[in-house]
From Swiss-Prot:
rRNA-binding as UniProt keyword: no
Name of the protein described by the UniProt record: Protein yippee-like 1
Localization annotation: Nucleus
UniProt keyword terms in alphabetical order: Metal-binding, Nucleus, Zinc
Spans through the membrane: none
Predominant place of localization: nucleus
Binding site for Zn(2+): C23, C26, C79, C82
GO function terms (MF aspect): metal ion binding
Entry's family note: Belongs to the yippee family.
Cellular component, GO annotation: nucleus
Higher taxonomy: Eukaryota, Metazoa, Chordata, Craniata, Vertebrata
Length: 118
């Protein structure tokens, strides 16, 4: 008897010629380097990067949290493949100086690696 196992499939593959960031746990692509906005963010487990857009990421329900820069409505994001929580999405910023974060994504360095062309 042959045991069949389900292979891992990803929703999106980023082009191999680009520098990409991947989930450290399962290697699913998460973001293209061109989508990186800032490396100067702090996550709940250390340093984090702010991205304009991401792939292969699911989003939980939004909730209000007081972060280092004030009150925000954020939703936890997780890897669609391995379900590891990666960071969060900024849904709403209550401070006018923080509005640029709305719709953007935080991924903690503890959960991603650099792939392709580094």
């Amino acid at each position: 008897m042959v045991k069949m196992t389900k292979s891992k499939t990803f929703q999106a593959y980023l082009p191999h010629c680009h520098r990409t960031y991947s989930c450290i746990h399962c290697r699913a692509h998460l973001a293209n380097h061109d989508e990186l906005i800032s490396k100067s963010f702090q996550g709940s487990q250390g340093r984090a990067y702010l991205f304009n857009s991401v792939v292969n990421v699911g989003c939980g329900p939004a909730e209000e949290r007081v972060l280092l820069t004030g009150l925000h409505a954020v939703a936890d994001i997780y890897c669609e493949n391995c379900k590891t929580t990666l960071g969060w999405k900024y849904e709403h910023a209550f401070e006018s100086s923080q509005k640029y974060k709305e719709g953007k994504f935080i991924i903690e360095l503890a959960h991603m690696i650099k792939d392709n062309g580094w």
